[in-house]
Amino acid sequence: MGLFSFMQEIAMDLGTANTIIIHNDKIVVDEPSVVALDRKTNKAIAVGEKAQQMHGKVHEGIKTVRPLRDGAIADFDAAEQMMREMIKTATSHNRWFSSPSLKIVVCIPSGSTEVERRAVRDSSEHAGGREVYTIYEPMAAAIGVGIDVEAPEGNMIVDIGGGTTEIAVISLAG
């Protein structure tokens, strides 16, 4: 990114158990994928660790939900609110993020259907992403550990998550 670049970039691993956001090669958010919602308005009261601490300990006006199941979005509205709040947390140190120029790369399970991919893309856009890209989790894991995914050699990747486990062999960028 150049000195005057207003496009900010983050990578998000939207997991069943935890959500991680990376900015400038640093983990800036690592929180449980949990949202505490007001039962009347269905608005987020807390996300992440704060919502996790409320689980099972709140009064009848508040419910806690895990918006992802088996690596896919199960509750679109809750997922969107969780992503919006976590992106706010990740970007609060930089005033330029308040502009509409946010590029988000989101990891998705390799077995995702078109509907599931669209749900991730839509949630990311509604949460503030101007440009949204998806990448399969095994490919992101391979790139993240420094494997040359374009090399003509096979690399086995095992991605163990809270809702899915994926095993892939990556060679020649595919």
Give the location of each predicted region.
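Nucleotide/phosphate-binding catalytic cleft detector across ATP-hydrolyzing
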Residues: M1-G162, A168-G174
